[in-house]
Design a protein with these regions (language model features):
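A solvent-exposed, acidic/Ser-Thr-rich amphipathic alpha-helical stretch
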Residues: 5-9, 24-78, 101
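A short hydrophobic beta-strand element
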Residues: 78-91
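Short, cysteine-centered beta-strand-loop-beta hairpins and adjacent loop/turn segments enriched
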Residues: 92-100
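Short beta-strand edge/turn micro-motifs at domain boundaries
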Residues: 103-128
Length: 128
């Protein structure tokens, strides 16, 4: 993996670490304020930070919380100041939750802005 691809992958990992820590700011540091998202548990396209925050607020405290997120099998292509990331996310829950592990197929688009890679679009689908 080249240096630029590694930087993008580190930003992807930082988002997942922020999620597990319950740290929105850590996540948001790696998202463009105008990012769009296809979330696996929310059908409409999320457009921008305000819609993302509204979705997060509606979801807060509902359902089991993941205990581990492992992003695997990354495929990253960098085209100048744009990067395309594909990977599978393994989501694990506490055994007592009764929730099975989830496999989520993820594709994201990143843009280099002021020396930092920011996610401008994310698309995830739960694999059954």
């Amino acid at each position: 993996m080249g240096d630029e691809a590694r930087q993008v992958w580190e930003a992807v990992q930082a988002i997942y670490a922020g999620f597990l820590a319950g740290d929105r700011e850590a996540i948001d540091r790696n998202l463009s304020p105008e990012a769009t998202l296809w979330d696996s548990a929310h059908e409409p396209l999320v457009r921008g930070r305000a819609e993302l925050d509204a979705m997060r607020d509606r979801r807060a405290g509902s359902g089991p919380t993941p205990t581990a997120l492992d992003a695997v099998d990354p495929v990253i292509d960098v085209f100048g100041d744009v990067a395309l990331v594909r990977h599978v996310l393994l989501v694990r829950f506490a055994p007592e939750s009764g929730e099975p592990e989830q496999r989520i197929r993820n594709t994201s688009v990143w843009r280099l802005e002021d020396g930092r890679w920011l996610c401008v679009h994310n698309h995830e689908d739960v694999l059954r």
